[in-house]
Amino acid sequence: MHARRSLLKFVAAAIGLSLAGGASVALAQAKLKVAAVYTVPVEQQWVSRIHKALNAAKDRGEIEYVFSEKVANADYERVMREFAEKGNQLIVGESFAVEAAARKVAKDYPKTAFRMGSSGKPQAPNFAVFDNYIQEPAYLTGMIAGGMTKSNRIGMVGGYPIPEVNRLMHAFMAGAKEVNPKVEFTVTFIGSWFDPPKAKEAAFAMIEKGADVLYAERFGVSDAAKERGKFAIGNVIDTQREYPNTVVASALWNMEPTIDRALKAVKGNAFKAEDYGQYSLMKYKGSELAPLGTFASKVPADLVARVKAKEKDILDGKFKVAVVETEPKSTAK
């Protein structure tokens, strides 16, 4: 009888250990449920960087990732709520045009983490914000543009004159002015985040007025530059592969540092309302100057040296790019 009880205890213990082990494995393999809401197609520059970082986390097996793209502003709140109701632990998106609605949803789902591109401040307890703080590489690309223009006229095509766009344009202009004080700018906003034909037409108009370098804040600008044999400077992504003889340099935005920090916070039950914007700075590897690639031998060596020296000063904390968020104005006559 004693032997039988001992055997039963042994079996029970073994089963308990097995179950505990299984639970541990299941816990270790548990993936965060992440959803994203995008107002534009995922191939659009800005959103593509978020999409890329989230897909990387998905490929590593860290998250389950679902998203909705081309969501109209009027539908944004509804889509956010649907994702929250489905138990997604982190919801990512861009709330620039739907700020009030997005914050209302976050308030209604306090146990869900929200990390939204926003011009506003964080909202306790669960609405964190982020932004593409890539003014540092934008300054460096401006230096290159200022050194490459022959006409001393640079055209700049943007989506909307919001702080997130304005600061990049001002940084670019300041970089160009450092290298070439004579340079003048023509600035146009097309009133859309994704309208390549309209951006292209705006760029053509600038070329007609003498611009030989174009700042491509929107898709479509590089197409105009290519067709007219002019140079383009990329923003957020590097499209030199598609435009090998047109895109001289690009300011790259890397969303991985921002996304990875948010995922870590949610996993550790430490997510809170904070501003993730700083993780887009070069020191966090959140942004960088793209390799010159096909233009490595075409950009003057002395200009490359100046840019590299400035890049080092930025990384060493010896030079700080000014953040100017007012609407940039044309200076060309």
PLM segments and residue spans:
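Extracytoplasmic "Venus flytrap"
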Residues: 33-60, 66-76, 96, 161-167
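Flexible loop/hinge segments that line or gate small-molecule binding clefts
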Residues: 107-132, 236-246
